[in-house]
Regions:
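SAM-dependent methyltransferase
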Residues: 102, 107-176
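Conserved class I S-adenosyl-L-methionine
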Residues: 6-13
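C-terminal lobe and adjacent flexible extensions of AdoMet/dcAdoMet transferase-like proteins
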Residues: 170-200
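Class I SAM-dependent methyltransferase SAM/SAH-binding core
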Residues: 18-64
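Glycine-rich helix-loop-beta junction characteristic of Rossmann-like nucleotide cofactor-binding loops
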Residues: 1-4
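A short SAM/SAH-binding and catalytic strip from SAM-dependent methyltransferases
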Residues: 71-87
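A short glycine-rich, Lys/Arg-flanked "PGG" loop and its adjoining helix->strand segment in the class I
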Residues: 90-102
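A short acidic, Gly/Pro-enriched loop at the edge of an enzyme's catalytic core
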Residues: 63-72
Length: 200
């Protein structure tokens, strides 16, 4: 998306702002939203450290559309499918369409259920910034459940995070995006532009 044509970008579910900040560094005017106040505060801190004035971060539910339109909306790293009710996830896409300018582009990066079901790693552990982490994953009722636990000398007690994501396939997205008013331009299997396949 050239900056000259897609100046204003919304990062939907921005977390700690990793992608928002990269986009801002490339010259886009970026708004990042996330429900986590802690994540947004961290994103603001990093943006300030990098002296970026073309990015703002807001604590906001992705189901609640902003009262403005953007040239582009990005939803990256499977930041979708969090809600138990399918209708709520559909509403996220409908509201995303409302926030797009007439010639705007929506880019969504989402897992491939076929690949996940075949290659799910039930557990793993390692080190991250002097902390030990343990991750467990399971598939149940059409969702992936992930638990991440951090422990280490710098923590008073182990910190645990839980995530769940719906296993929506490509056909589901085609139907729901079409019903929401989107026209699908391309579907890729990776960031290099490879075709989407069952093993992507």
């Amino acid at each position: 998306m050239p900056v000259s044509s897609y100046r204003n970008i919304l990062d939907l579910g921005c977390g700690r702002g990793r992608h928002s900040i990269t986009l801002a560094q490339r010259g886009y005017q970026v708004t990042g939203i996330d429900l986590s106040k802690k994540a947004i505060n961290k994103a603001k801190q990093v943006a300030k450290q990098k002296d970026l004035h073309n990015v703002q971060f807001l604590v906001r539910d992705m189901r609640d559309p902003l009262p403005k339109q953007f040239d582009g909306v990005v939803n990256l790293f499977t930041t979708f499918g969090y809600f138990l009710e399918d209708e709520e996830n559909r509403n996220v896409l409908r509201n995303t369409k409302k926030m797009l300018a007439k010639e705007g582009v929506f880019f969504i990066d989402y897992l491939n259920p076929q690949y996940v079901e075949k290659n799910l790693v039930p557990s793993e552990s390692g080190m991250y910034e002097n902390l030990t982490y343990n991750v467990t994953r399971k598939i149940k009722d059409g969702m992936v459940f992930k638990t991440i636990q951090f422990s280490g000398d710098s923590l008073d007690k182990p910190v645990k995070y839980r995530e769940r994501v719906k296993l929506y396939g490509l056909e589901w997205f085609r139907d729901v995006l079409g019903d929401s008013g989107f026209k699908i331009i391309e579907t890729y299997g990776n960031y290099d532009g490879a075709p989407f396949l069952a093993e992507s």
